[in-house]
Amino acid sequence: MTLIVTGAAGFIGANIVKALNERGETRIIAVDNLTRADKFKNLVDCEIDDYLDKTEFVERFARGDFGKVRAVFHEGACSDTMETDGRYMMDNNFRYSRAVLDACLAQGAQFLYASSAAIYGGSTRFVEERSVEAPLNVYGYSKFLFDQVVRRVLPNAKSQIAGFRYFNVYGPRETHKGRMASVAFHNFNQFRAEGKVKLFGEYNGYAAGEQTRDFVSVEDVAKVNLFFFDHPEKSGIFNLGTGRAQPFNDIASTVVNTLRALDNLPPLTLAQQVEQGLIEYVPFPDALRGKYQCFTQADQTKLRAAGYDAPFLTVQEGVDRYVRWLSGQV
């Protein structure tokens, strides 16, 4: 049976395609916005059956042109949290997603989709409950609104619907994201260009570089998606993060030490890195005051209750792997 991955040439989508290939799955229809032709580079080492534009795909899928479709991994979306065009965001992230969901329900296909931790906005609790969901931007709102549709549909759905609220994802195949790429990606490139990594100084009670995020490797994101793919009886909306909040200092320090290791240099403590000017703290920008999350941490209770029991990579493990991969691409 056919598998479909939307956003297949994007960051998470391409990693899911690659993970499916590693399991021997090659009957994959890759869907993306083909107006950005250069994104195909993420699929060069992948095996797929077809590569379709997102608009053509929705029309053909609704008509049943692809025969029996087992599952759709719906990763296609505008993920730019700074985007301010509400019409574009709602068309791309909400209405498009509804059309794909409707086609999956009509054809009995599994529907696994990308939600986002941006739904939580400025909340200090990160649990899949309506009471703590308060998005701060139109991107988060578009994801929030679609999750509400899913909640209404789930009780009567005859096929799987599984949504994943991604926290701060990093890893291979994100180069095309530019300014929206992960902190690890930017730290790597900054260190190679300038010989140091710059982090925000103290803010809102957090010491310099100690603002924290739940940083999750795209390797783990792909594994969770495939776990639910293997268990079509499991539906719901789930946080997808490590359950650990780690400071930006951990990312920067791991980037520095991994690059040092590749140059056969010994590791340094964070204090030594700061003392030697390898990590530098800059004043917290006024433009971000009051709009910046200093803490995110996924509540994994629901994910673990669904049966996913594999450990998640720490920042030290995942970023080390990622930096070595990036170094091999240069």
UniProtKB/Swiss-Prot annotation:
UniProt keywords, alphabetically: Carbohydrate metabolism, Isomerase, NADP
SS bond list: none
GO terms under biological process: ADP-L-glycero-beta-D-manno-heptose biosynthetic process; carbohydrate metabolic process
Superkingdom per UniProt: Bacteria
Active-site positions on this chain: 139, 177
Record-given protein name: ADP-L-glycero-D-manno-heptose-6-epimerase
Pathways per UniProt: Nucleotide-sugar biosynthesis; ADP-L-glycero-beta-D-manno-heptose biosynthesis; ADP-L-glycero-beta-D-manno-heptose from D-glycero-beta-D-manno-heptose 7-phosphate: step 4/4
